[in-house]
């Protein structure tokens, strides 16, 4: 059986683990820049200039990382053949 991935959680977790500088665009148009420190189903903690901000996800429009994030590890040869 194929595993189901939650892209949002995987993406945010990679940003957090790799300490990728990220711009968070809010639906109001305001921009916040910093590092993702933690997240859950409803909030994201962003650290910028030594200060933390708790941002509600419903207020976020876009995450724009400073560099690309690898979303999935390469599949094994066996998985590719069975498709």
From Swiss-Prot:
It comes from the Bacteria. This is RNA-binding protein Hfq. It comes from Exiguobacterium sibiricum (strain DSM 17290 / CCUG 55495 / CIP 109462 / JCM 13490 / 255-15). SUPFAM superfamilies: Sm-like ribonucleoproteins. One of its GO terms (molecular function) is RNA binding. CDD domains: Hfq (cd01716). HAMAP family: Hfq. GO terms for biological process: regulation of DNA-templated transcription; regulation of RNA stability; regulation of translation, ncRNA-mediated. Residues 9-69 form the Sm domain. Keywords: RNA-binding, Stress response. RNA chaperone that binds small regulatory RNA (sRNAs) and mRNAs to facilitate mRNA translational regulation in response to envelope stress, environmental stress and changes in metabolite concentrations. Also binds with high specificity to tRNAs.
């Amino acid at each position: 059986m194929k595993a189901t991935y939650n892209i949002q959680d995987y993406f945010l977790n990679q940003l957090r683990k790799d300490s990728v500088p990220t711009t968070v665009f809010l639906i109001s148009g305001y921009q916040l820049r910093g590092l993702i420190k933690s997240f859950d189903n409803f909030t994201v903690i962003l650290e910028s200039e030594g200060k933390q901000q708790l941002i509600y996800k419903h207020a976020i429009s876009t995450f724009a990382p400073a560099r690309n994030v690898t979303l999935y590890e390469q599949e094994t040869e066996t998985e590719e053949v069975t498709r």
